[in-house]
From Swiss-Prot:
It comes from the Eukaryota. Residues 69-81 have a biased composition (Low complexity). The gene is VANGL2. This is Vang-like protein 2. InterPro entries: VANGL. It comes from Homo sapiens. Belongs to the Vang family. It is a multi-pass membrane protein.
Amino acid sequence: MDTESQYSGYSYKSGHSRSSRKHRDRRDRHRSKSRDGGRGDKSVTIQAPGEPLLDNESTRGDERDDNWGETTTVVTGTSEHSISHDDLTRIAKDMEDSVPLDCSRHLGVAAGATLALLSFLTPLAFLLLPPLLWREELEPCGTACEGLFISVAFKLLILLLGSWALFFRRPKASLPRVFVLRALLMVLVFLLVVSYWLFYGVRILDARERSYQGVVQFAVSLVDALLFVHYLAVVLLELRQLQPQFTLKVVRSTDGASRFYNVGHLSIQRVAVWILEKYYHDFPVYNPALLNLPKSVLAKKVSGFKVYSLGEENSTNNSTGQSRAVIAAAARRRDNSHNEYYYEEAEHERRVRKRRARLVVAVEEAFTHIKRLQEEEQKNPREVMDPREAAQAIFASMARAMQKYLRTTKQQPYHTMESILQHLEFCITHDMTPKAFLERYLAAGPTIQYHKERWLAKQWTLVSEEPVTNGLKDGIVFLLKRQDFSLVVSTKKVPFFKLSEEFVDPKSHKFVMRLQSETSV
């Protein structure tokens, strides 16, 4: 009873102190407002719209809007510029996209083009220099020599087309390091051409070789060597990576979306480029709004306890025992956060199904209206609407259902009104069904399906403990990082399978069925 009387006394005092504190706050605020009107000092007013500045927090604090942070008005006396989190994200993305001019990539392309031009013009120079320098001393070229001209011409044409198809393709990415195999091939071609030029200068130019057929055969041998180098390039750059040797597991660090891929012998940086190509059309679009837990779970407060010692005698022992009892009681209380999360998820799924049903019905009615208009136009020809006008005409009937569904599924940042109209116009133009129109919105599509401004990152960072020019090995882990998330790639070598053969004699499957007079068949 003493404890209850003390508790009620504390409650009365606390309530009285709250009421007196409110009156004192009103009086102080009125005085400060009158002083601020005369001085013109800085002032900050934060007020939720639709509610008075002073409300009973003890009774209405839990009934406020969950989105109060989005509707709060902030007025400052010194602010001339404002910035939001979206602005900061946009600025960071602009800084990420503003990649400086990559001189190394253009230098590599220029070196490759120069070397290709040198190797292509060298056989022609071998054929043209002797007639230009010592035409009178050359022996006449016979039929076999003239036939070699045709061989050189077609081989050079094949070499030109093959080099264009293999080397002069639009680059998919800018690699952080040199492509080792391609650099080795370029060095090999350079050494081959320089060796032929040295031999040509010493044995043909200095000696003034009179046999023009020997000069032509020397040029043909150079073209043949270049063709073999091109064949080697095809094997090293294209065929070597086709045989699967490793299994890659790619996991997105934020939501855990994962995929498995099989690749051949590639360097780490080339595997990174290949993974990014697969990522944009295999992984669903990254939606950070789906990562947050429900607000009811996040806002749950853990109850705390304060232990006060009211007596003077044996205060230490009493307080220690009481605190232990309270802590033990708190430990025995079960945390019901998982139950709240379960019911929140069930409620969200029910809401999504409801919004989806309304959206499907609205789209079906809109497309039915389009078909009815088309049938009426065939019977009574009049002014025909183009697909854009038809899309704008029926969009109003489905706009509200579409907006609510996108908000419920948190897809509204990825679908603007203009993009929905363009997709609707596309479906009307190609006479597509309502299900074909809704396919883009009912499920999250691949990343490349959405507008580039929403997902495209021009710069990724490759993080690896191994040099990126090394080939893949079993157990290698590397990361592909961008501003919002990263892709974690782990490598496993394809196991070696040993198969054994077991011969089964066909006669072992045969059997004899003996029938007796009592046997019924």
